[in-house]
């Protein structure tokens, strides 16, 4: 067995579960349950980070982008769980030190673990979003501990997203989030590209709360994660600076929820459909974003499914 698999199977506290026939079903009811599940998934990664903590090499399976982006992706994606954990009052000193060191090393052009100079349509821009959201919501973990030089390096590395072309689709939110993050910590950002990205996102709106993912007309579980989810995050991050759009995105989320609820069964199970097959954990992200943004489009007892 691969060592990572061994650690996953035997490490960390177990969330509660129950059996439904031959199927093991997790019974997640409390914050502690979800915290235990997060640790179950992420704790096995701790010994796998690179020496400088900026990279994770988790296997040899292939993707369409290069090894640099693969290892950055593995570094950044755990932040989608760790940042809410920190914002909710959680603490894990080991992960906090890993990400402090990793951000410093990965953004340092003189460091062998530097994430590099980006180009057109670069996968690195996708991974910037998690870092940006971390800076926006948990700066005391991901920004404040950095030295002045490390902050300048990280801002410069993130700022590359403003110097290159990105796809005309949900990727616009990555540039939006990066610019919001840079602005929030007093670093150079592009108000012009921030507004341009928001205008593009607005152009995707198709009515009744729905948006398309750019020019694509398909509708699947990816859309709520790629558009509505980030829209709700924006509505909270920019509530004071862009109240008109913040209110608009919340209104659209209210409309969207009335239809999207029927994409889940009474137990919360979702259909194995579309691009969503590789993003199963993101299928319910819209509902989590609603709660975090203080929005209750449906009774909480129903959302809790």
Segments predicted by a language model, with ranges:
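Glycine-centered tight turns/hairpins at beta-strand boundaries that repeat
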Residues: 3, 7-14
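Conserved small/polar residues in nucleotide/adenosyl-binding loops
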Residues: 9, 303-305
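A detector of repeated loop/turn-to-beta-strand junctions in beta-rich toroidal repeat architectures
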Residues: 18-20
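Low-complexity, Ser/Thr/Pro/Gly-enriched N-terminal "stalk/linker" regions
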Residues: 25-73, 97-102
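Aromatic-lined, polymer-binding surfaces characteristic
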Residues: 71-72, 82-84, 96-256, 261-291
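Extended polysaccharide-engagement surfaces of secreted carbohydrate-active enzymes
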Residues: 291-303
């Amino acid at each position: 067995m691969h060592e990572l698999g061994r650690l996953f199977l035997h490490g960390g506290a177990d969330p509660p579960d129950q059996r439904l026939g031959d199927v093991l079903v997790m019974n997640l009811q409390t914050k502690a349950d979800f915290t235990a599940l997060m640790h179950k998934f992420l704790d096995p990664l701790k010994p796998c980070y690179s020496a400088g903590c900026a990279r994770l090499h988790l296997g040899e399976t292939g993707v369409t982008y290069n090894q640099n982006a693969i290892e950055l992706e593995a570094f950044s994606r755990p932040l989608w769980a760790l940042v809410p954990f920190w914002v909710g009052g959680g603490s894990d000193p080991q992960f906090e030190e890993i990400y402090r060191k990793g951000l410093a090393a990965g953004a340092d052009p003189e460091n062998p673990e530097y994430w590099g100079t980006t180009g057109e349509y670069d996968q690195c821009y996708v991974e910037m979003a998690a870092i940006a959201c971390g800076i926006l919501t948990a700066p005391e973990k991901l920004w404040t501990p950095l030295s002045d030089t490390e902050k300048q390096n990280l801002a410069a590395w993130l700022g590359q997203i403003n110097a290159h072309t990105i796809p005309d689709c949900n990727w616009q939110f990555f540039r939006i989030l990066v610019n919001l993050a840079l602005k929030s910590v007093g670093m150079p950002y592009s108000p012009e590209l921030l507004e341009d990205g928001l205008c593009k996102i607005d152009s995707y709106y198709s009515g009744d709360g729905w948006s398309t993912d750019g020019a694509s007309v398909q509708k699947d579980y990816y859309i709520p994660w790629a558009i509505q989810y980030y829209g709700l995050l924006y509505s909270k991050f920019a509530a004071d600076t862009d109240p008109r759009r913040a209110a608009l995105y919340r209104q659209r989320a209210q409309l969207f929820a009335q239809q999207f609820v029927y994409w889940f069964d009474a137990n919360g199970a979702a259909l194995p459909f579309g691009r969503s097959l590789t993003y199963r954990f993101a299928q319910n992200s819209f509902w989590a974003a609603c709660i975090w943004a203080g929005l209750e489009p449906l009774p909480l007892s129903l959302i809790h499914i």
